[in-house]
Amino acid sequence: MGGRIALFVTFFGTLIAIIWGGFVGIFCGLVGGRVDDIVMRIIDAFLAIPWILAMLLIVVILGTSTQVLIPALGFFYGKGIVRVARAATHDVIARDFIMAAKARGHSNFSIIWNELFPNVRDAIMVEGAMRWSWMLLAFSSLSFLGFGVSPPTPDWGLMISEGRGLMSFAYWSVIAPIVALSSLIIGINLSADALAKALGIDRTQKAPV
């Protein structure tokens, strides 16, 4: 039961991150120039803000409902996907089929949807899977600190927080949710690594600045 709300929030948060991060990254990689520079400097500025401070500010002002947590997590974890999508776009932007699409007068949206997205989709999905695991840890951390879901909603982070006072005689009340959360995060990470290897994606490659 403890993982249901965490999976719900982080799954849809990851979808939001993939959608907006992927589109912005591909668009910046395609148009380049001043637009690319401005957007990436904005992304860099947001990346410099500690996510925990920003999330705490958001939940204090707007509350801890899923309608707040899902888009907030999706925004903060989409910034990294922007860089990955942009780097993947740079790898294919000079290929002949992109040049041909530009020569035929296709719009940027048409090139993104029909030419670029099918070629960078795999990299975005692998990065999204990794962000999902990090988002699970972030969501559980918020619940542990009392800024996530509220009782009686079952959540692993909340269970760990409430079980701390029972460690002396009921240690399993803390160990069980820790093991469950750790197993899920490790499983998602291993699945993402396996997917990257199957698709031939090098996750160690640096994104261009």
Feature map (PLM): residue ranges:
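Glycine-rich helix-loop "coupling/hinge" segments at transmembrane-helix boundaries
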Residues: I58-I61, A88-T89, A138-A180, T204
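Generic hydrophobic transmembrane alpha-helix motif, especially the helices
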Residues: I16-W20, G29-D91
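Transmembrane helix boundary and interhelical loop/hinge segments in multi-pass membrane proteins
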Residues: R34, A87-F97, S191, L195-D202
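Non-cytoplasmic
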Residues: L53-L57, S65-I70, G74-R83, I124-L158
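Alpha-helical membrane-interface segments at transmembrane helix boundaries
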Residues: M1-F8, D36-L47, G63, F117, ...
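Transmembrane alpha-helix signature in integral membrane proteins
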Residues: M1-L30
